């Protein structure tokens, strides 16, 4: 058995949309609160789907959070007495989030991040590959494909009911009006207008 020391670590919760990432983040943070640990939660300002100052899961569970525009803002908060730091929708931050999360863990914090591992095109989402590489614990969740009911690993973006084009902007904050969970077989990315003309 491993001997544990009072050092920090990084836990990453990832998967497609509707796989329960925020739900799992909230569950872990609440366990810390029940254990009388000091918990602080951050979320990106861009994610204002349900509430600006709370992490809210798709089924309505919520926890208070500090709204930040950049990862650097995390370091502006007094965290010396904090045991557990949660960060939701981590894919919306720039790559500097990786160094910040590592610094927090090195300073003895348990850091739990949650975010999409792939964008709507099925490609790695910004800082997630690096965060996965430096994490001690990784949980990859799956939703259920909205087409066939198989486990889903992808996020399907829909624009007016049609698959988004490959050259559409990467970030479009939305919920079930814009996205569906899909399996590999039913995940579709439409070609760009230029690609259509070349066909």
Curated annotation (Swiss-Prot):
Identify the residues that bind ATP. Answer: 15-22, 88-91
Molecular functions per Gene Ontology: ATP binding; thymidine kinase activity; zinc ion binding
Q: Which GO terms describe its cellular component?
A: cytosol
Where, subcellularly, is it found? Cytoplasm
Q: Top EC class per UniProt?
A: transferase
Q: Which superkingdom heads the taxonomic lineage of this protein's source?
A: Bacteria
Q: Which reaction does it catalyse?
A: thymidine + ATP = dTMP + ADP + H(+)
Active site as annotated: 89
Record carries keyword Cell cycle: no
- EC number of this enzyme: 2.7.1.21
Q: What keywords are annotated for this sequence in UniProt?
A: ATP-binding, Cytoplasm, DNA synthesis, Kinase, Metal-binding, Nucleotide-binding, Transferase, Zinc
Annotated positions binding Zn(2+): 145, 148, 183, 186
Q: Name one GO biological process term.
A: thymidine metabolic process
Family according to the record: Belongs to the thymidine kinase family.
Q: Cross-referenced PANTHER family, in alphabetical order?
A: THYMIDINE KINASE, THYMIDINE KINASE, CYTOSOLIC
Q: How does it assemble?
A: Homotetramer.
Protein name as annotated: Thymidine kinase
Tell me the organism's taxonomic lineage.
Bacteria, Bacillati, Bacillota, Bacilli, Bacillales
Which gene name does the record give? tdk
